Amino acid sequence: MQTKRWSFILLCNFLILSSYAEDFRLTAFHPAINGFSQGEKPLIRSQKDASDNQGIYKMWGDIEYKGDPWVRNISRPNTITHGLYNRHIALWASHGRFYNAKTGAWEWQRPNLFGTNEDLFTQTIVVPYLIPMLQNAGAVVFTPRERDWQKNEIIVDNDGNTDASVYTETTAKDIWRSTNTRGFAQHTGAYANGENPFEAGTARMTKTTTKERNTSEIVYRPQIPEAGRYVVYVSYQTVAGSISDAQYTIFHKGQKTVFKVNQQMGGGTWVYLGTFDFDRGCNPYNQVVLSNKSSQHGVVTGDAVRFGGGMGNIQRGGDVSNLPRSLEGARYYAQWAGAPYSVYNTKGGEDDYGDDINARSNMVNWLAGGSVFVPSLEGKGVPLELSLAVHSDAGFAENGTSLVGSLAICTTDYNDGRLNTNISRMISRDFADALLSDVTRDIRQTYHDWARRDLLDRNYSETRNPEIPSAILETMSHQNFPDMLRGQDPNFRFTLARSIYKTILRFITTQHGQSYTVEPLAPTDFAIAFVGKNKIKLSWTAVQDSLEPTASPTSYNVYMATGTGGFNNGRRTKRPSLTLELEPGVHYRFKVTAVNRGGESFPTEVLSAVYRSNTAKTILVVNGFHRLSGPTVINTEFEQGFDLNRDAGVSEGLTAGWAGAQQCFDKSCMGIEGPGGLGFGGDEMAGRFVMGNTFDYVATHTEAIASVARYNVVSCSSRAIESGKVQIGTYPCVDLILGLEKFTPSALRFYKTFTPKMQKILRAYTQKHGRLMVSGAYLGSDQTNTNGERFLAEVLKVKFSGTNRLDTLPYIKGMEQEFEIYQALNDKHYAAIAPDILEPLTPAYCALRYQNEQSAGVAYDGSDYKCFTMAFPFECIRSPKVRNDIMRGILTYLLK
């Protein structure tokens, strides 16, 4: 009896110690707990750690989601086995516009500083960089703020469409009928607090089929008001018999991409499929088709499909925000997405600020409830397993030169230190520590300096409320100029986002005891050349990531578009080159991504080719516009800040990051909040999207050349020329695109119109009777040293004579044309705000003039070579017809 009693006691002690084991294994890694000084090495460090799983506790244990992903793109040419495929992540940028009941006005949650505010700035990290990186690794990403920087919104639905959009049902065998649950329906005008659009209408359903002849479809054909990029959201109802492979086909500019959606989860809300280019109008080349064809026996349901992020439509205090929905807080998106009233209205309708904070994590729990990761809460069954809030915060260095840097936040002391699955909340601390350590390491190794701040364990809503591992990353101080000097540079934001993506990858795979591979960087030295009568060879060079040994590419995806159509879904090739045959007279466009087991890189620049005939001359178009940068920097003894009016910088594609021009530059006002404080600025740009560098301007040039119908055309990156890969001497004519390229002292990357190497190459080309066309906004102002001025004079036959503000002088004339260029910030094309004045040097002459008669274009018709130099970017000419006519005139002049 005594032996049995002691055996029972020993068993109890063993169970108690076992219950503490997971906490012990975690706390051993935490400096604040084990007594070590706070270091900078996170728990997860290397591929070896992840693959061998030595010394690392697999926190999820046997908890694993084994079903189909919520959404999967089956048109993707590559397979992801060591990335984030079938991982579901919740992620958001901080804050957003909200209604302040105390003031009776819509306001930002954070002040305008250095041209932006936190509500806008953190989106420029998350939307163009972090979310795509995670998706390229195979993850399904949910964000409780609208992700689409698009003001238009078109809804196609069985209960009513936007404008002239068309909803059509076709039936082969089983008819479409209404579900027993409510569905989406829209109405015109604003929505009152508490109105749920997903309770206002109906949804449709039919039985599935495995046979093509029995296929029934719903066609959602939008009336697109203007050509552009639009997000595509679908909706449906999860019912008894729902399938996990509902097939949606998106037709976008003539191409089609097929998705499988798991309708066994996530019904009754907007489900993101992707973002695509659509043409203006209503036609079968731009639509979404839902099919009942499935490998499973059950039912498929269909409800509204939404194209575009749209404008905010939730009324508070008698008015809507009058801003794009993407700039609003999560509280209002949650209502539009069909979330229950309790998710976004936690303060009785009296405090939208508090509601917005809570809505972010409440949406996570609402979606994840009922999944393996949040099993005891009622919800939509989406297996979200990680939550991250990306913020910036306040604080400044009094010396005006030091960095404030990053900090991370977690919450472990809540619900007895347990998450919904009963695993320890210390897992969130490991995640926060890894984020902070990796960001510090990656930024220091890339840009030499960064400040690591604290790892805080605090009671914050965004880390307390989620029932899955969570963290807040305060990326930097938006109040500290040295921090924002880096933060406003798109290259820095890419590095920051890539570090966060890599941490998420390491963390999730390690917690499941799996190995990982980091997705590659984009290839470089992209070039196209003819290698036969109508054959071209595309070639590029892999880029190795010095920070990540696993990030090497093992293959590549080559994407192609023809005419005005969209890009296809890609063709995989193992070699860094591909040979193709071209059809005569067709305008081709190409871009390339690098691929490995972990995912896919961002794409290269877009290059183009046109084959006319075997006897036609071949023109080489060169892209030399690679610049990404923040605005003009002012940093003197007495002043600091950014001058958006002089140069707003160059974002990567579209940006929503600007609030307004900085007004106070006085360093003595550092730390003052509001008007009169250093960095304070206006709100005149709020709600405006601004286009930056889309890296596809070669196509604008080649399209204009193709309109002449006399020449073959190929293209390359200027980097391929400088590396020696492309020899321009074999081409009778070269068209060099320089856009907004220029050297900027404060930039984190080096850019230059004509580097010494490029000067040497172009000089040699003209000495051998080459024909050269060059266009760009800063050709002269970027070459003000002795060697640069000599190159301008001796090769281009021009002299820099100042700049021209085109906001008051919008027209350019010459070559029997009078035309406008993009000269003001806009959401369609980058703007040449203040291009150079380039005066001709004898015997060259002025061929184009600004409205004030200053020289805008110079032609040199020598017996040795010919050259045509434009002081503004050719691709900034607004009218396609004018571009074609100007290009025809230039080529006739150069090749006569």
Language-model features: locations:
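Short alpha-beta junction capping motif
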Residues: 619-625, 632-644, 724-786, 861, ...
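A glycine-rich, often tryptophan-bearing local segment used as a flexible ligand/cofactor-contacting loop or short
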Residues: 740-846, 851-852, 882, 886
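Beta-strand-rich modules
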Residues: 579-600
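Active-site microenvironments of hydrolase-like enzyme catalytic domains
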Residues: 327-425, 457-479
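Active-site-adjacent mobile loop/cap segments within catalytic or ligand-binding domains
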Residues: 304-312, 371, 386, 392-399, ...
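Short beta-strand-plus-loop segments that form exposed binding edges in beta-rich domains
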Residues: 288-299
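Pro/Thr/Ser/Gly-rich low-complexity, intrinsically disordered linker/stalk tracts
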Residues: 507-550, 584, 598-617
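Aromatic-Pro/Gly-enriched surface loop or interdomain linker
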Residues: 114, 118, 129-137, 145-146, ...
